[in-house]
Amino acid sequence: MRRRRKLEHKTYKLNIESFSHEGRGIAHFEDKIIFVSDALPGELVIANRTFSCAKFEEADAKEILKPADNRMKPKCDVFGICGGCSFQNLSSEDQIQIKSRWLKKVFARQAKVEPETWLKSLQFQSWGYRRKARLGIRYVAKKDKVLIGFRERKSSFITNMSRCEVLHPSIGEHLEVLANCIERLSIKSSIPQFEVVISESGIALILRHLESLSVKDEKILADCAQELNITFYTQSGGLDSVKPLDEPTILTYSHSNYNIIMEFLPTDFVQVNFKLNQQMVSLAVELLELNESDKVIDLFCGLGNFTLPIARYAKYVVGIEGDLGLVERAKYNAEKNSINNVDFYRSDLCKEVVGFEWFKGKTYNKALIDPSRSGAIEIVELLPKLGVTRLVYVSCNPATLARDTLKLIKLGFTLETAGVIDMFPQTSHVESIALFVKR
């Protein structure tokens, strides 16, 4: 991480020439590249420098002298301060175009390839979509006030938010109620964060606390839970310390196209955008072109988000996941949904796997990969040994997707099609999906 030293005050007058993938304007000044927050291509701005190194500088736009025609008024009154969003000054269409251009650029630059066709970008609602988030909490003693929000941009401070426009409204519209609740606790200065998940069947909120809650504190939380129709979970240490304050709530999301209901725990990884997740899974199933003779392997399968819908059409599916708890819940969800042609195994896919039962002597003609941001270079190299000829790759990092694409091409695969999944509207985060075929 770069160390940020104190800078002499410097103000620029800049013409913004283009846009970076993370949502900053790009300008040039005295042979240096300047990355400018809150500035759009075509704008003339006054900007204050915030960072400097040999190759580039960073700045914040303080005055827009000539706004771009496509500049939008942000919906949120803390946009530009809060680090949660970076694209609220752009329309949904412009956001998609920027993300699509970035994906194309990364493919061309790193993998020296372009897909034979481009998929239409997947998108749904732009606001109130986010069903899982971690927000910071800070008690300000001088004001006797609790702040709840995402971290400020380029800062560890908590944004003072009364509402959040991207969070699902069942929580996003009630941050003040939560703040008022925490202000009444005896340990309000020892609560650094909460994590919330808004499922289709209930809401769970995990409250991290560094001191023990009193009986009175628990009563305050119980009253707040009743008011907001949520279930509080407390967390005094690691993940194994998470426990419900009262009766646990059953958390679910559905794949209605496949008659599947998924149950999960509040600490489990799930996609934050349920509606777009349904679209993404349907697209993946479509791209796999499944039939009753297919044997499919789903790598980094998690709860079985893709595995179980795939099993509705394939002969047999194997899901591989490194987290034992997720493997156990994937098995539970398969049984609960009466899906019998699937097996799940625990394996660390970043380590040697050739000796495992699901690998040794086994073949699969189709595969799905949905790795973390670090990508799947280790497992990609093994796909030919498994007999895979058709692969759907779901990515949350275009850079590692492009790196793995280069390896797949060397292994004889062709990049048939790819496109953007706008899982996180109003942010610069780029999810994508790609189809590879080995002839």
From Swiss-Prot:
Residue intervals of the TRAM domain: 5-63
Example GO biological process: rRNA base methylation
HAMAP family: 23SrRNA_methyltr_RlmD (MF_01010)
Enzyme class: transferase
Positions of the catalytic residues: 396 (nucleophile)
Catalytic activity: uridine(1939) in 23S rRNA + S-adenosyl-L-methionine = 5-methyluridine(1939) in 23S rRNA + S-adenosyl-L-homocysteine + H(+)
GO terms for MF: 4 iron, 4 sulfur cluster binding; iron ion binding; RNA binding; rRNA (uridine-C5-)-methyltransferase activity
Function: Catalyzes the formation of 5-methyl-uridine at position 1939 (m5U1939) in 23S rRNA.
UniProt binding sites for S-adenosyl-L-methionine: 271, 300, 305, 321, 348, 370
Keyword Transferase: yes
Gene3D superfamilies cross-referenced by the UniProt entry: 2.40.50.1070, Nucleic acid-binding proteins (2.40.50.140), Vaccinia Virus protein VP39 (3.40.50.150)
Name of the molecule in the record: 23S rRNA (uracil(1939)-C(5))-methyltransferase RlmD
S-adenosyl-L-methionine listed as a keyword: yes
InterPro entries listed in its UniProt record: 23S_rRNA_MeTrfase_RlmD, MeTrfase_TrmA_AS, MeTrfase_TrmA_CS, NA-bd_OB-fold, SAM-dependent_MTases_sf, TRAM_dom, U5_MeTrfase_fam
Family: Belongs to the class I-like SAM-binding methyltransferase superfamily. RNA M5U methyltransferase family. RlmD subfamily.
UniProt EC number: 2.1.1.190
Record keywords: 4Fe-4S, Iron, Iron-sulfur, Metal-binding, Methyltransferase, rRNA processing, S-adenosyl-L-methionine, Transferase
Residues reported to bind [4Fe-4S] cluster: 76, 82, 85, 164
Species whose genome carries this gene: Vesicomyosocius okutanii subsp. Calyptogena okutanii (strain HA)
